[in-house]
Amino acid sequence: MKKIYILGNGSFAQEVFEQIIVANQIKNFGGFIILKDDKAFCIGEEGAEAFTYPPSAQFILGTANPNWRKKFYNHFLGYYELNINHWPNMAAPNSYQSLSSTIGIGNLFLMFSLVNANTQVGNFNLLCTFTSISVNCGIGNHNVLSPYSSISKNVCIENSNLLESGEILFEDLESECILTNGVVYAND
């Protein structure tokens, strides 16, 4: 049986465990994975041990920190193909993704996150609790929407952006920006 692992082991990874693994009654949980000195270790029921990179493993990016998300992604990209078999989309039972939306791979939808009609979602995006993406939107890859953040209708954002808690985005956003306190900061 193929196992699913959470990449990360902090408090956010514990939240992902409760909202995804426990709430969906997933029985093939393999453990939490950490990186130390560019080596992967699995923390499971029997303690921590070197990760053996099983060929059928599946992964959930279980950190909200953009830097750690990038480290995990880059590390495991060297061992696993970018496909839905290794990087499934995972959703809390009370999240919603419109049937008319298009969704890539490796996305994580936590409790009460909402993806409305005719929206395109790229790969490896994180929608935290109570986030929403309105109709006719598009988001690229590797974006983090913190709790209670929203993207207004007909808005597109590119890649590797961070919307801080409670922010509402009304205009398109280029790559590598942070929206906080109503101000967009380019990540130069």
Question: Where in this protein do the model-derived segments appear?
Answer:
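Flexible, charged surface loops at secondary-structure boundaries
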Residues: 1, 26-27, 51-56
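Residues at the starts of beta-strands that form the adenosine-phosphate
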Residues: 3, 28-30, 58, 86
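Glycine-rich adenosine-cofactor-binding loop
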Residues: 2-20
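Short hydrophobic segments within beta-strands
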Residues: 6-7, 62, 164
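NAD(P)-binding Rossmann-fold cofactor-contacting core
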Residues: 23-41
